[in-house]
Amino acid sequence: MAKLPASNSLEVLVEKAILTCSLNGVLTNPKQHPVPVTPEQVAASARDAFNAGASIMHIHFRMQEEDLGHLPSWEPQVAADLEAAIRDACPGVIINQTTGVVGPDVSGPIACMRRIKPEIAACNAGTLNYLKLKKDGSWAWPPMVFDNPVEKVAEMLAVMKETHARPEFECFDVGIVRSVGLYQDNGMCTKAQYNFVMGVASGMPADTELLPLLLKYMKPGAFWQTTLIGQKEIWPVHQKTAELGGMLRTGVEDTFYLPSGERTTGNGQLIETLAQYARNAGRAVASPAEARQML
C-alpha cells in the first residue's frame, strides 16, 4: 500500500483506491470513437464515470467548432465551460488538467490553469521520442519529440504552485521516474506524485514485471498510479497496480477495450470495471471526500 503518515483515519483511507477517469484525450476523433467533446457530452460522460466510482476527472480541452472536435484547444473560456459542466454533473469531483504541449510555448496550459484552478495538474516530467508504427512498418505519424526540458517543467511547476494545483508527474520511462526525485531534492516541488505511463510504443510497456522496479526508484511513501495505454493486455497491469497499493486510472483517452477484448461503450463502463479490479484486490473505492483527504 502507498505509505502515509500514521494516524487511525489515514490507515483506514489508505486501503481505499482513488479512481481517475481520463475523459477524452488530445486527438482521438469523436466521429470514430466514443470521446466526449462538448460541455454537454463531457458532463454526461463524467457523470457516468463518477457514478461508477471515479473521484478525479482528467480532462483535455477540445475545439468546440463543428468538425474540429478532434483538435486541442487552449482557450481559457473553453476550459472554464468544460470544468463547470463537470463540476455541476459531479458534486465534489476533483479536476486533473492536462498541460502537455510540444515546444517551448506553455502559455496555453498556463492560461487554462489560471482560469480554472484545478486541484491537480499533469506535469510531463521528461522528454520522449513519441513514435508509433503501422502494421506495414511505416510511421503512424511523423516521428516527434515530446520535449519536456527542465526549464519547461520548472515553468509549469511555478504556475501549479501559484494556482495551488498538485503536480502529478507523468513518467514515460525509469529515467523520468528518477528525474522526479531530483526535482524534489532540488526544491522544484515539495511532494512527488507519480503517474507511470505504460503502453506508449516508444516508452515503457504495459508489463506487470516493471512495477516493482518503478516503485523501487520513486520517492518513498509517494502517491502513485498507472496510466495504461492499449487493449485487453493492460488489464492485468491494472490488477497488479491495485494489489500493490497504487491508485487507478482508465478512460477512453487510454483504451477503448474491456478485459474481454470487447469495445467499451464509454467511460462509465471502463470505470465500473476498474472499480471491480480494486475490490478484487480487497480495496474499497474512495469517495471524492476521502480522495481529497488522502491527497
Question: What are the functions of these language-model segments?
Answer:
Residues 120-253, 264:
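Catalytic alpha/beta core domains of metabolic enzymes, predominantly
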Residues 56, 169-170, 281-290:
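Flexible, glycine/charged-enriched surface loops at secondary-structure junctions
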Residues 55-80, 198, 256-260:
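Glycine-rich, proline-tolerant flexible connector loops at the mouths of alpha/beta enzymes
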Residues 133-140, 144, 260-283:
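C-terminal helical cap(s) of enzyme catalytic domains, especially alpha/beta-barrels
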Residues 73-147:
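Active-site beta->alpha loop and helix N-cap motifs at the rims of alpha/beta catalytic domains
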Residues 21, 68-97, 153-160, 213-221, ...:
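Alpha-helix-loop-beta-strand connector modules within alpha/beta enzyme cores
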Residues 42, 49, 60, 121, ...:
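Conserved, mostly hydrophobic/aromatic
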Residues 7-34, 127-139:
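N-terminal small/glycine-rich loop or linker at the start of catalytic domains
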